[in-house]
């Protein structure tokens, strides 16, 4: 199953990942009553949420024990009660917080490694929801109504209270049981207006030494990919569904200098959605997930001379 991960943060000093899943409910006080009555809170809570969140909450407890996992349950515009589930060793430990108390904890954890350069949360998109990803989830789960979820972005901004975020979201995340492999999908919206999805690439705006450099995002994704020992797919798309979508499987990356090697694929929007639907229910034993598609390998020699070679990036794929 495929779903988004709301927030992941890696601490260099602790060598540890912190994961946050935000679930907005209609009545937080009814959940508080379940806690007080010592009923089967976890089972009853899962019944009250949508299928995408249920799938996430089924997988999160099974992730590596070195990941500190938090489920934050809140009600919009209610600040006197937030329920946080700390998950470890297969146990769900609930704690009650006020918004202020949770914000103090959240900001302290966000700054655990001290001051580092990082883009502010929400800079990439002006609204809180990622409509492209939500539309994909609507198709994958065959929902009657369009899926709507801001992945906790609004409450995260409030919790940080202006601090620069050290965390990031994973647009789509998957564990494939037949291959025992994790997949990370990151969607990169092409808003340049002058470069096609096929020629778009993070090296055009990362590892540039400019103020708007976005390398931290890709370093964080690369660390997560290595931690999970999985695959990382970067998907370049635009608002024009008639334009081909570009997928880059990141094979190797240097935190200091950028991309070292990748395999690149291109396909139409409709074929991309069909491929994702196949991935959503993948049961094959091999992990050649894109074996049906033509690809081009860009190696260390290509990326070592990126300034000169970028004009040739994407050649061989037709717009």
Predicted feature locations:
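Acidic-basic catalytic patches of nuclease active cores, encompassing PD-(D/E)XK
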Residues: 1-16, 62-67, 75-81, 88-168, ...
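Short, well-structured alpha-helical interface segments that form or flank functional binding sites
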Residues: 2, 165-170, 212-223
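Conserved catalytic cores of phosphodiester-cleaving nucleases, focusing on short active-site segments
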Residues: 3-59, 170-199
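Surface-exposed cleft-lining segments at the edges of enzyme active sites
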Residues: 24-26, 153-160, 194-209
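A short acidic, glycine-rich active-site loop
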Residues: 45-57, 202-219
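Nucleic-acid nuclease catalytic cores
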Residues: 50-89, 219-252
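Polybasic, proline/glycine-rich intrinsically disordered low-complexity segments
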Residues: 244-288
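Charged phosphate-binding loop/patch that engages nucleotide di/tri-phosphates or the phosphate backbone
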Residues: 272-319
């Amino acid at each position: 199953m495929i779903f988004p991960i709301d927030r992941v943060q890696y601490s260099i000093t602790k060598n540890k990942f912190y994961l946050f899943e935000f679930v907005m409910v209609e009545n937080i006080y009814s959940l508080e009553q379940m806690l007080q009555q010592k009923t089967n809170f976890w089972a009853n809570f899962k019944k009250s949420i949508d299928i995408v969140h249920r799938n996430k909450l089924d997988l999160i407890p099974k992730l590596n024990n070195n990941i500190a996992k938090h489920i934050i349950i809140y009600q919009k515009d209610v600040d006197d009660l937030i329920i946080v589930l700390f998950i470890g060793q297969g146990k769900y430990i609930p704690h009650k917080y006020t918004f202020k108390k949770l914000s103090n904890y959240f900001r302290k954890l966000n700054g655990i490694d001290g001051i580092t350069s990082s883009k502010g949360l929400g800079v990439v998109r002006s609204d809180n929801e990622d409509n492209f990803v939500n539309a994909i989830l609507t198709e994958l789960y065959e929902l009657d109504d369009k899926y709507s979820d801001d992945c906790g972005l609004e409450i995260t901004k409030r919790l940080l209270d202006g601090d620069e975020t050290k965390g990031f979201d994973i647009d789509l995340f998957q564990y494939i049981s037949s291959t025992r492999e994790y997949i990370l999908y990151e969607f990169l919206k092409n808003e340049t207006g002058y470069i096609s999805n096929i020629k778009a690439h993070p090296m055009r705006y990362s590892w540039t030494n400019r103020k708007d450099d976005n390398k931290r995002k890709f370093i964080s994704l690369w660390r997560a990919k290595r931690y999970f020992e999985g695959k990382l797919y970067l998907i370049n798309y635009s608002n024009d569904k008639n334009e081909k979508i570009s997928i880059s499987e990141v094979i190797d990356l240097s935190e200091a200098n950028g991309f070292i090697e990748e395999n690149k694929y291109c396909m139409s929007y409709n074929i991309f959605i069909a491929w994702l639907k196949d991935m959503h229910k993948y049961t094959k034993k091999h992990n050649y997930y894109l074996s049906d598609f033509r690809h081009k390998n860009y190696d260390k020699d290509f990326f070592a001379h990126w300034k000169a070679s970028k004009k040739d990036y994407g050649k061989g794929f037709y717009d």
